[in-house]
Amino acid sequence: MEPVDPNLEPWKHPGSQPRTACTNCYCKKCCFHCQVCFITKGLGISYGRKKRRQRQRAPDSSQNHQDSLSKQPSSQPRGDPTGPKESKKEVERETETDPLD
């Protein structure tokens, strides 16, 4: 390490700040410009306030879409509800007609 003049403030030490100003460019050279550029541009870390996105108002067509969903018939259970009962009856009939030896 080079000896630093004790009369200089820490932010004025040589090498503490880059010679050129930071830019909005995201090229590789600018991403490694200084520590701040590397953290914000290179790593994508920013601790500032996040801008709030304004909600977009739903157009009138979305109301019609909701209405069409409510008009659709509700889902019914799949298969014939009497199907399993009939198959049991058929099995019982087969066992009665075919005696076991």
UniProtKB/Swiss-Prot annotation:
GO terms, biological process: DNA-templated transcription; positive regulation of transcription elongation by RNA polymerase II; positive regulation of viral transcription; symbiont-mediated perturbation of host chromatin organization; symbiont-mediated suppression of host innate immune response; symbiont-mediated suppression of host translation initiation; symbiont-mediated suppression of host type I interferon-mediated signaling pathway
Glycyl lysine isopeptide (Lys-Gly) (interchain with G-Cter in ubiquitin) crosslink location in chain: 71
Highest taxon in the source lineage: Viruses
Any single Gene Ontology cellular-component annotation: host cell cytoplasm
Segments for region (Core): 38-48
TM region positions: none
Stretches the record annotates as Interaction with human CREBBP: 1-24
Keyword terms of this UniProt record: Acetylation, Activator, AIDS, Apoptosis, Host cytoplasm, Host nucleus, Host-virus interaction, Inhibition of host innate immune response by virus, Inhibition of host interferon signaling pathway by virus, Interferon antiviral system evasion, Isopeptide bond, Metal-binding, Methylation, Modulation of host chromatin by virus, Modulation of host PP1 activity by virus, Phosphoprotein, RNA-binding, Secreted, Transcription, Transcription regulation, Ubl conjugation, Viral immunoevasion, Zinc
PTM summary: Asymmetrical arginine methylation by host PRMT6 seems to diminish the transactivation capacity of Tat and affects the interaction with host CCNT1. Acetylation by EP300, CREBBP, GCN5L2/GCN5 and PCAF regulates the transactivation activity of Tat. EP300-mediated acetylation of Lys-50 promotes dissociation of Tat from the TAR RNA through the competitive binding to PCAF's bromodomain. In addition, the non-acetylated Tat's N-terminus can also interact with PCAF. PCAF-mediated acetylation of Lys-28 enhances Tat's binding to CCNT1. Lys-50 is deacetylated by SIRT1.
Positions bound to Zn(2+) 1: 22, 33-34, 37
Residue numbers of Asymmetric dimethylarginine PTMs: 52-53
Entries under Pfam families matching the protein: Tat (PF00539)
Site entry: Essential for Tat translocation through the endosomal membrane: 11
Segments for region (Interaction with the host capping enzyme RNGTT): 49-86
Region named Transactivation: 1-48
Annotated stretches, region: Cysteine-rich: 22-37
Motif (Cell attachment site): 78-80
Motif Nuclear localization signal, RNA-binding (TAR), and protein transduction positions after renumbering to this chain: 49-57
Protein's UniProt keywords contain Nucleotide-binding: no
InterPro entries in the cross-refs: IV_Tat (IPR001831), Tat_dom_sf (IPR036963)
Residue stretches of biased makeup (Basic and acidic residues): 83-101
Disordered: region residues: 48-101
Sites of N6-acetyllysine modification: 28, 50-51
Domain notes for this protein: The cell attachment site mediates the interaction with ITGAV/ITGB3 and ITGA5/ITGB1 integrins, leading to vascular cell migration and invasion. This interaction also provides endothelial cells with the adhesion signal they require to grow in response to mitogens. The Cys-rich region may bind 2 zinc ions. This region is involved in binding to KAT5.
Family: Belongs to the lentiviruses Tat family.
Name this polypeptide is given: Protein Tat
Native organism: Human immunodeficiency virus type 1 group M subtype B (isolate SF33)
